[in-house]
Amino acid sequence: MNYLKLVHLFLAVTMMGTVMISCVKKEAPVRFAIASDFHAPDVPGGKERVETFIKAASDENVDFIIELGDFCRLDSASQVYRDVWNSFKGEKHHAIGNHDLDRYSVDEYVVGMGMPNRYYSFDKGNFHFVVLDGNNYSDGEEIHHYDHANYGKYPLSNHSYMDKEQMEWLEKDLASTDLKTVLLSHQSLE
């Protein structure tokens, strides 16, 4: 089986699982498709990977799609991947991954991808979704945001921190809702 077929199989089986969340029978389910680490401009068949995801999400008639980072660059050569992503007719969301900031500041990436902020929340059905940004590293004294691949000079044990500002925002955001909450992030939350 060639690499492209393996990528498509991987997408179909693991990355493209449409997630249905419903805890009480009376509630309408919220259906969304989630993907991460497309690395679209850097892998063979990057455009086809995104197209496969969008087609599957459209076929499943999901309420929204979200990618959890390491998607594509903001340069004109990567516009094709953003166009495929934006071809989805429904609601679309992004989280920022570490490699999304290899060439950009967080502000450049947020604006370039049309995100409301580097972390944000939204409600869908009876659920509250929180998109977090774990793209921070510690230099041993302070927490700094990733910016133009600056995270590479520190060991992995110093990566993936949530900054104080974001944690304070998260505390207020969670206190403001009674809905069941789903946290989404490129990095693991430990």
Each model region followed by its residue ranges:
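Positively charged n-region of N-terminal signal peptides that target proteins for export
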Residues: 1-7
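Bacterial N-terminal signal peptides
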Residues: 8-18
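N-terminal active-site segment of His-dependent metallophosphoesterases
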Residues: 22-80, 165
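Active-site-proximal beta-strand elements of phosphoester/diester hydrolases
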Residues: 29-42, 126-140, 184
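Active-site neighborhood of phospho(di)ester-bond hydrolases with catalytic His/Asp-centered motifs
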Residues: 34-36, 64-70, 92-98, 182-186
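Glycine-rich phosphate-binding loop signature in dinucleotide/nucleotide-binding domains
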Residues: 57-61, 173-178
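Extended active-site neighborhood of metal-dependent phosphoesterases/phosphodiesterases
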Residues: 77-177
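Short acidic, glycine-rich surface-loop motifs adjacent to enzyme active sites
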Residues: 174-190
